[in-house]
């Protein structure tokens, strides 16, 4: 049966690969690069980049004329507008092109062509310019756009290089543009958005010489605020320190697949940069020109927070703890639902569609976060809330033993019935984590045993209530009466419920569900959400279908990293035009940590390890893992006898196992 599934999958993969288009290449530096001369033009794209007080969606293109164009959409999450709701961040678009104001020998600079575009924590273009259309290029301009790591500011660095065989005089004008919003529209009155050029003047450049100037786009309160005098080059150094230090020095993936390695690195960037400093503390926000200074039970509690301990990014861990504590404030004696979202810098909430299974999302995410974080202090703060959420879910059980909820994270976009598979699976995983946490929190053996018994009963109920033949596949109905395949049928596989793994993956990877952009939300629709595709990939690895999962993960990574919309996982289509929401990047990283490497936390310093290495790989490693309060590495190597040799190195000490593929080992870090 598994061979038949693999054969059918191969046909689907071949068809999908034929429709994919690679536009980018991976450079030795780790950046991705676009050569406009090597692709069909015009080409256009958008990318989001963020810092603690700003986010920028850069919409850029290389036209059929090979000219580079850029528009910046600036978002300032802590500058709130009225109505101060989910979407109440100050926003302003800036399309100013400063280069036509620059001159060479008193003649206007004219762009001739684009040589290269690259992305590596910043958006960089290299363009050629002269003083007349069609004339020989005289200068090469490198323009780099990036967000400040700490300030409400987006920055640009321009470097102009003389590529002519003669001396030139470069003239850069003074430039300042400001916009003042209406006081009646701002929570704190009027706001000023100001763009400034630094480095104006005349520069004599011999052949091969370069000169640089910079621009900044910032915002501040008109009353009581003032513009910052920017040091753009220092801001660039800080941005690169974040990329090279916080991101590149931890959780380093090595596999034979360079595309997956690179996309994992880029996903680490997006998952970690989208954290905003607000009056409510550090708050991760999905982004997408919509979701800032706010958290959700799915995007943050469920998707991205459990990832941060592995990276060891202190800002991420702080935002995760703050997120859970904010929701903990809403536990109540009546066991009414917690809000789905905490918005407006933590000052308001949103629960517009009722209970989405939010407490189940928290139990899954917080349980895994606390175990992987390895901090007793944090666990003591959150354990009462975790127990409350578990009890809330228990009280929602229907007569068949699965939890009720009004809807799910898709919020009525697609039907979810009165009880859905997503809420049930998340609650199940929360119970498993609680059984591990309980003794660490001083609970009795009976308490831990109770959580395990509840998990066992729920697992059985999931099989009996949701297990079904849908469309000819032995898989799951997403809700009672559902007769169309749904993407979220992948969830049981992520949490060790693999009774129907083969039929489920055959359904998900069939041509009825799988597309070049991932898995359809529902059979027969045109809608896809990356989040369920990423869960499915994690589940496929976890269930032992590593070869099938690898092909799909490679295709997905190639599409997102090197295709026509790069370089991060996206939210959805057609909704949102494939915005780079950052929670999905956290889910990509968890495909690796929890799927490929099969890490399942079991204590503050222990985990189960189930290496799910594809058969065509001879080895792989994950280095400098910062979870459990340690810095350790995992390496897996296939031996001549068909076994897998595992090395776990921590604190200068190495432990080795030799296992059969599919076996699980229990690791305790000492």
Spans of features found by a protein language model:
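Bacterial Sec-dependent N-terminal signal peptides
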Residues: 1-21
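Terminal accessory carbohydrate-recognition/targeting modules of carbohydrate-active enzymes
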Residues: 18-262, 545-549, 557, 599-670
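Amphipathic, well-ordered alpha-helical segments in soluble domains
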Residues: 91-100, 299, 323, 358-365, ...
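The feature captures the catalytic groove of carbohydrate-active enzymes
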Residues: 204-233, 284, 288-294, 339-361, ...
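Substrate-binding groove/exosite segments of carbohydrate-active enzymes
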Residues: 244-380, 388, 407-409, 484-494, ...
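Proline-centered turn/helix-capping motifs that create local helix->coil transitions or kinks
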Residues: 275-278, 331-336, 394-404, 464-471, ...
């Amino acid at each position: 049966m598994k061979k038949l599934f693999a054969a059918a999958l191969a046909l689907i993969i071949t068809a999908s690969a034929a429709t994919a288009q690679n536009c980018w290449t991976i450079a030795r530096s780790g950046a991705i690069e676009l050569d406009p001369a090597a692709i069909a033009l015009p080409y256009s794209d958008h990318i989001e980049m963020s810092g603690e007080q700003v986010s920028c969606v850069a919409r850029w293109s290389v036209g059929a004329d090979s000219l580079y164009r850029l528009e910046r959409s600036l978002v300032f999450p802590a500058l709130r507008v009225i109505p101060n709701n989910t979407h109440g961040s100050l926003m302003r678009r800036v399309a100013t092109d400063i280069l036509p104001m620059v001159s060479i020998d008193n003649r206007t600079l004219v762009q001739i062509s684009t040589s290269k575009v690259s992305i590596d924590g910043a958006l960089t273009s290299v363009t050629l310019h002269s003083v007349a259309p069609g004339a020989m290029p005289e200068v090469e301009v490198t323009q780099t756009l990036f967000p400040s790591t700490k300030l409400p500011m987006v920055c640009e660095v321009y470097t102009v290089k003389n590529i002519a065989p003669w001396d030139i005089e470069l003239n850069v004008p003074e430039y300042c543009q400001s916009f003042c919003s209406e006081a009646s529209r701002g929570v704190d009155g009027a706001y000023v958005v100001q763009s400034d050029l630094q480095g104006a003047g005349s520069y004599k450049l011999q052949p091969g010489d370069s000169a640089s100037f910079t621009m900044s786009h910032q915002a501040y309160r008109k009353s009581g605020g003032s513009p910052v005098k920017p040091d753009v080059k220092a801001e660039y150094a800080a941005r690169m320190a974040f990329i090279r230090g916080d991101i590149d020095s931890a959780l380093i993936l090595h596999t034979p697949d360079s595309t997956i390695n690179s996309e994992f690195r880029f996903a680490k960037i997006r998952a970690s940069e989208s954290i905003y400093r607000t009056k409510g503390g550090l708050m991760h926000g999905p982004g997408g020109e919509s979701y800032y200074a706010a958290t959700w039970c799915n995007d943050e509690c469920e998707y991205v927070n459990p990832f941060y301990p592995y990276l060891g990014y202190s800002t991420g861990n702080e935002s995760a703890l703050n997120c859970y504590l904010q929701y903990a404030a809403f536990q109540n004696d009546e066991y009414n639902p917690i809000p789905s979202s905490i918005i407006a810098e933590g000052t308001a909430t949103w629960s517009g569609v009722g209970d989405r299974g939010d407490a189940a999302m928290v139990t899954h995410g917080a349980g895994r976060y606390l175990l992987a974080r390895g901090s007793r202090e944090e666990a003591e703060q959150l354990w009462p809330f975790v127990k409350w959420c578990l009890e809330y879910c228990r009280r929602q059980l229907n007569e068949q033993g699965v939890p009720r909820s009004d809807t799910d994270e898709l919020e009525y976009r697609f039907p979810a019935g009165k009880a859905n598979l997503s809420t049930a699976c998340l609650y199940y995983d929360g119970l498993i984590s609680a059984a591990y946490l309980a003794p660490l929190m001083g609970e009795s053996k009976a308490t831990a045993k109770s959580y395990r018994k509840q998990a066992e009963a729920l697992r059985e109920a999931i099989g009996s209530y949701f297990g079904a033949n849908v469309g000819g596949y032995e898989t799951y109905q997403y809700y009672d009466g559902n007769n169309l395949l749904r993407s979220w049928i992948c969830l049981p596989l992520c949490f060790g419920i693999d009774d129907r793994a083969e039929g489920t993956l055959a359904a998900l990877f069939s041509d009825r569900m799988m597309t070049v952009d991932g898995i359809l939300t529902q059979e027969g629709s045109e809608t896809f959400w990356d989040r369920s595709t990423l869960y499915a990939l994690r589940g496929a690895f976890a269930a032992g279908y590593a070869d099938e999962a690898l092909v799909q993960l490679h295709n997905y990574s190639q599409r997102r990293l090197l295709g026509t919309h790069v370089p991060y996982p996206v939210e959805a289509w057609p909704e949102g035009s494939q915005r780079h929401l950052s929670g999905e990047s956290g889910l990509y990283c968890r495909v690796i940590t929890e799927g490929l490497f099969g890490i399942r936390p079991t204590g503050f310093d222990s985990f189960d390890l189930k290496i799910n290495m594809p058969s065509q790989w001879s080895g792989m490693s994950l280095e400098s893992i910062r979870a459990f309060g340690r810095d350790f590495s995992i390496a897996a190597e296939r031996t001549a006898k068909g076994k897998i040799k595992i090395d776990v190195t921590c604190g200068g000490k190495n432990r080795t196992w030799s296992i059969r593929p599919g076996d699980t080992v229990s690791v305790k870090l000492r």
